[in-house]
Regions:
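Sterically constrained small-residue positions within well-ordered secondary structures
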Residues: 8, 26, 130-131
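Acidic/histidine-rich, surface-exposed loop or edge segments in extracytoplasmic proteins
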Residues: 33-46
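Peptidyl-prolyl cis-trans isomerase
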Residues: 48-144
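Acidic/polar surface patches and capping/hinge elements
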Residues: 18-30
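Bacterial N-terminal signal peptides
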Residues: 2-12
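A residue-level signal for beta-strand positions that form part of recognition/binding surfaces
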Residues: 29-34, 139
Length: 144
């Protein structure tokens, strides 16, 4: 089962609720590429057998390799439980969404929180969490 961007975003909790305004130091628009490391039961319809502990170990190994300079796109191809290339444009809270972007409020909370804190080229991680990142671990690289 291959997930495309639109279904994956729906799966990852797309909501239309307006939240508070973006923080002044945060950018208005970003583009990120991510690797989703799920675990058994975290992605409905995907037969993932790893445990949450195995997912955490794998996610942090990928993060370490990425921060050491491994080709991020190659890591996405090799490891993501989302569709390749895993690139998403996002507009911040209170900012109009440009063509091809998704509103930050429509993404899993931790995904946007990490993405908007990164500088271009930086890599971070959103830990699996039932409320803020229920689909697994997101290794996120800000590309724009």
């Amino acid at each position: 089962l291959a997930l495309t961007a639109a279904p994956m975003l729906a799966l990852c909790g797309m909501v239309r609720a307006e939240g508070p305004q973006s923080q002044p130091a945060e950018p208005k628009h970003i583009q990120v590429q991510h690797i989703l490391v799920g675990y058994g039961g975290s992605l409905p319809g995907k037969p993932i057998t790893r445990t949450i502990e195995e997912a955490k170990k794998l996610a942090y190994e990928i993060l370490e390799n990425a921060r050491k300079g491994a080709d991020f796109d190659a890591l996405v191809k090799q490891h993501t439980d989302d569709a390749h290339p895993g690139i998403y444009g996002m507009s911040n809270k209170g900012v109009a969404t440009a063509a091809g972007e998704y509103p930050r409020s429509g993404m899993v909370g931790a995904f946007g929180d990490v993405g908007f804190k990164l500088k271009v080229g930086e890599i971070g991680i959103a830990d699996a969490n039932p409320k803020t990142s229920p689909y697994g671990y997101h290794i996120i690289k800000r590309v724009k």
